[in-house]
């Protein structure tokens, strides 16, 4: 059984002819990460994982327990800032629109610009971290976040919503360099498959609902107290980022191995991918404002598709060091996981925006009360994330992934039928609790899958994969939701009808996520059963 387990682990990590050189592909079986990760969960012991990863583990990363705790704290705050940055405009979107004199249809850009850029650049930032140093890229990201968060507040005095939206985009660019490199550092420091690593990733995942809650709540508090002081929501965000920047300098080890396989950056693929992603996202978020009948919208859409098709072909056939390892690109199970995350979090992005539209414009809540209704995310999100950390050794990640998509679907359905005059403590309270499990089962489970089953030299990229899908899908699908809204709201005369229409699209996306993740879960169980049977047979023969 020990030999069988070691073989499975070698397959899941990527088998190399020489560990000091670039990985050499031996066979299609060696590169089928999706199959090996399932078998690993059933046949591999923790001790074997430690031994096989010893080359990558430095026992002197932390001399004292408090150093490790401080490191974990800085990682958690990084995730908090990511989600807070996404939601901090939601509770004050009407205040921002009034301040800049924005048109109603352009409100989606107040939220979408941040995840658009962060989602488009995260994959590149993770690869840059793998090549030039995870900690270096993390600190670069914080510098960008600090500067552009301050500029977001200063844009008030320009009176230009375009300037604000661009500043939000650069704020998202900074976050793109923070979170994937944080997860990459965790992947390098902690041994894959161990309880310690799982619980740390779960702690980081638990910060998503906390960040989402604090972002909209704090901004709502400032906006309700004095709408003219809304820039302080961004000044405070910048201060928090600066504090964590300083802590990260001292808390994050500087001895993490950097690019020992001498990879180079795939600049051609990076340019093709980023341009394609940004243009596609721009089209979907701008079309509801300008109209799909505009020639430039159609032209940009065609150009974006061409860039993305060329990017995929280049990465598969021509790139010497592709942004995505070919084992991931060609592995059906990895694609399944990413598609499930895309549709699930896309539906959540639609819910998030139209939830606040519903609260502010239909129920006429104040910015503070609208932000305060997110409080259930804080409580139940922590519970959900810790549930993953404490049970992941006994429950397949595919199970958590499936039920997280079910939570996204059920939450979207409940949001689409919430009565206007019903108290918050009925349907909406239940919706928030259920959606908490959508967020905080999917993020830790998928992060653990990718981190444990990719080689250590790809840990920055492993963190990038999950965050790219999460952030980009929230922005892109929001544009799709806005398109549906504008088509059914009778030129803004029936707001509720438009909001419901967007939520129905979210239900459709979440349903697709359920089907894809359900198929992956069933296949995982079948392969796990086969792996156990093979292991038992080996023991019997021995």
UniProtKB/Swiss-Prot annotation:
GO molecular function, one term: borate efflux transmembrane transporter activity
Glycosylated residues in this chain: 471
Principal place of residence: membrane
Recorded topology in the membrane: Multi-pass membrane protein
Keyword Glycoprotein set for record: yes
Residues exposed to the Cytoplasmic side: 1-108, 158-172, 220-231, 284-295, 355-371, 421-429, 527-542
CDD domains in UniProt: MFS_Amf1_MDR_like (cd17476)
Top-level taxon in the UniProt lineage: Eukaryota
GO cellular component: cell periphery; membrane; plasma membrane; vacuole
Topological domains annotated Extracellular: 130-136, 194-198, 253-262, 317-333, 393-399, 451-505
Disulfide bonds: none
Chain ranges passing through the membrane: 109-129, 137-157, 173-193, 199-219, 232-252, 263-283, 296-316, 334-354, 372-392, 400-420, 430-450, 506-526
GO-annotated biological processes: borate transport
Note: Present with 1720 molecules/cell in log phase SD medium.
Family to which this protein belongs: Belongs to the major facilitator superfamily.
Entry function: Putative component of the machinery responsible for pumping aminotriazole (and possibly other toxic compounds) out of the cell. Probable ATP-dependent export permease. Appears to confer resistance only to aminotriazole.
Comment, domains: Deletion of the C-terminal 34 residues abolishes ATR1 activity, while deletion of the C-terminal 23 residues have a minor effect.
Protein's UniProt name: Aminotriazole resistance protein
Organism of derivation: Saccharomyces cerevisiae (strain ATCC 204508 / S288c)
Gene this chain is encoded by: ATR1
């Amino acid at each position: 059984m020990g030999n069988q387990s070691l073989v499975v682990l070698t397959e899941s990590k990527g088998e190399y002819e020489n560990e000091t050189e670039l990985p050499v592909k031996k066979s299609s079986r060696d590169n089928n990460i999706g199959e090996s990760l399932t078998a690993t969960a059933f046949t591999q012991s923790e001790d074997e994982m430690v031994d096989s990863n010893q080359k990558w583990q430095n026992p002197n990363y932390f001399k004292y327990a408090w150093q490790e705790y401080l490191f974990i704290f800085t990682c958690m705050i990084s995730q908090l800032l990511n989600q807070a940055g996404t939601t901090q405009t939601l509770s004050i979107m009407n205040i921002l629109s009034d301040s800049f004199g924005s048109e109603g249809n352009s409100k989606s850009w107040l939220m979408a610009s941040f995840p658009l850029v962060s989602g488009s650049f995260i994959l590149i930032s993770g690869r840059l971290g793998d090549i030039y140093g995870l900690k270096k890229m993390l600190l670069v990201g914080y510098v960008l976040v600090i500067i552009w968060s301050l500029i977001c507040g200063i844009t008030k005095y320009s009176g230009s919503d375009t300037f604000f939206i661009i500043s939000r985009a650069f704020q998202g660019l900074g976050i793109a360099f923070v979170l994937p490199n944080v997860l990459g550092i965790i992947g390098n420091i902690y041994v894959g498959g161990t309880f310690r690593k799982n619980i740390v990733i779960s702690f980081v995942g638990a910060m998503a609902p906390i960040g989402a809650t604090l972002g909209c709540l704090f901004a709502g508090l400032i906006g309700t107290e004095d709408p003219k002081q809304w820039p302080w929501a961004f000044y405070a965000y910048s201060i928090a980022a600066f504090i964590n920047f300083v802590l990260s300098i001292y808390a994050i080890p500087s001895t993490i191995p950097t690019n020992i396989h001498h990879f180079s950056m795939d600049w051609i693929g990076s340019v093709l991918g980023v341009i394609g992603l940004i243009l596609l996202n721009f089209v979907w978020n701008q079309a509801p404002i300008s109209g799909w009948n505009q020639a430039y919208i159609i032209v940009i859409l065609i150009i974006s598709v061409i860039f993305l098709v060329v990017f995929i072909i280049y990465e598969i056939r021509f790139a010497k060091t592709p942004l995505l390892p070919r084992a991931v690109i060609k592995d059906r199970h990895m694609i399944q996981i990413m598609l499930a995350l895309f549709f699930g979090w896309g539906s959540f992005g639609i819910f998030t925006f139209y939830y606040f539209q519903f609260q502010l414009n239909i129920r006429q809540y104040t910015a503070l009360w609208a932000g305060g209704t997110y409080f259930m995310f804080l409580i139940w999100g922590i519970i959900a994330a810790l549930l993953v950390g404490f049970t992941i050794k006994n429950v397949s990640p595919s199970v958590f992934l499936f039920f997280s998509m079910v939570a996204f679907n059920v939450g979207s359905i409940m949001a689409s039928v919430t009565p206007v005059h019903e108290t918050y403590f009925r349907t909406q309270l239940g919706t928030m609790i259920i959606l908490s499990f959508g967020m905080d089962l999917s993020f830790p489970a998928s992060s653990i899958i990718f981190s444990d089953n990719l080689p250590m030299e790809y840990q920055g990229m492993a963190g990038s994969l999950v965050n790219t899908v999460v952030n980009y899908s929230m922005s892109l699908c929001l544009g799709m939701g806005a398109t549906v809204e504008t088509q059914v709201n009778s030129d803004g005369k029936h707001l509720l009808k438009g909001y419901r229409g967007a939520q129905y699209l979210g239900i459709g996306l979440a349903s697709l996520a359920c089907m894809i993740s359900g198929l992956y879960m069933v296949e995982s169980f079948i392969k796990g059963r086969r792996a156990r049977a093979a292991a038992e047979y080996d023991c019997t023969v021995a």
